[in-house]
């Protein structure tokens, strides 16, 4: 088995980091697992550092290459052999990314504790930044505030979105664009620490009364999010949850809205697996983490949650953010739009 993607390196090393160039799926090292041996393949400029600082308890034989020799992937294929599977395309190896992702679960107690801490820190950062933003700020400034607070905790962000006013209605992924903040602001990060992800979306409104159009869209999102959370029970089908989402949108008078954004998915070392709902065989498992990113035109909600040994828990909502309880088989306390 060849593991060249950064998220799979994070997983097999229990939080190690193969990154040099951040915005890239593959890292600067590969792990090869055979029946006899585990290998770390990297170029000499990175190999010793990764071996010393990023492998944690994983023992591997080091194979270091000079830049003018074989590529890391070619060397990995040579060691793995022609009947190998891989998380990236390399020569004749079978690409089996989703099968490899399935090995990440069930998650461990230690991974749960790391996710819980990351969720709590994320909640605190969103609350702090929300209280500090002001009308008229540029969206880049708000992004910088979020990224700075995460960086202080040694947390990186794979995604950061800041939307304001009409851009929240027009775009599902409002990258900062140099706009001044209006009354309505959407904040989103996909944060990562030790390879594990916490994807959160929160909203702020400046004023005494939230416009009905915004309030209605947000309420629909929360109700659908609560439904999805209620279905995160071991053995339930991902495809059935998608059917339920479609039904919820239709009942809310938005029958086409489900097509406009991914339905949500499993998270962890992979930032999000949003395609699980398309296969009728995929089932919810014990000890999984979830990222239900529910949108309706003008609103979005998203929290980190887990299905853990018979209980469901929202890890990114600690109670400091204004919230409301929703009933969907059980009670779910979900963040609301913060009014300032």
Describe the residue ranges of each PLM region:
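Active-site neighborhoods and metal-handling regions in enzymes and metal-associated proteins
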Residues: 1-340
């Amino acid at each position: 088995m060849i593991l060249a993607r950064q998220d799979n390196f994070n997983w097999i090393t229990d939080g190690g980091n193969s990154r040099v160039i951040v915005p890239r799926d593959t890292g600067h090292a590969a792990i090869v697992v055979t029946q006899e041996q585990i290998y770390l393949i990297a170029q000499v400029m990175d190999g010793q550092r990764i071996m010393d600082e990023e492998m944690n308890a994983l023992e591997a034989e080091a194979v270091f290459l000079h830049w003018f020799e074989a590529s890391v992937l070619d060397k990995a294929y040579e060691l793995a052999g022609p009947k190998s599977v891989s998380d990236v395309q390399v020569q004749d190896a079978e690409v089996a990314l989703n099968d490899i992702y399935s090995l990440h679960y069930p998650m461990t107690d230690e991974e749960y504790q790391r996710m819980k801490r990351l969720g709590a820190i994320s909640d605190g950062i969103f609350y702090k930044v929300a209280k500090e933003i002001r009308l008229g700020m540029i969206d880049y400034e708000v992004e910088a505030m979020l990224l700075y607070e995460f960086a202080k905790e040694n947390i990186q962000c794979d995604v950061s979105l800041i939307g304001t006013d009409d851009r929240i209605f027009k775009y599902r992924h409002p990258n900062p664009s140099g706009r001044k903040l209006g009354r309505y602001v959407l904040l989103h990060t996909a944060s990562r620490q030790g390879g594990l992800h916490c994807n959160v979306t929160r909203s702020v409104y400046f004023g005494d009364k939230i416009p009905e159009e915004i309030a209605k869209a947000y309420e629909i999102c929360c109700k659908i999010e609560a439904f999805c959370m209620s279905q995160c029970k071991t053995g339930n089908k991902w495809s059935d949850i998608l059917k339920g989402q479609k039904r919820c949108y239709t009942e809310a008078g938005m029958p086409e809205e489900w097509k406009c954004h991914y339905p949500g998915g499993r998270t962890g070392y992979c930032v999000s697996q949003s395609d699980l709902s398309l296969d009728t065989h995929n089932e919810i498992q014990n000890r999984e983490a979830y990222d239900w990113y529910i949108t309706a035109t003008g609103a979005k909600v998203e929290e980190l949650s887990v299905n853990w040994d018979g209980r469901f828990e929202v890890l990114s909502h600690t109670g400091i953010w204004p919230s409301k309880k929703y009933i969907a088989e059980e009670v779910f306390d979900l963040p609301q739009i913060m009014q300032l």
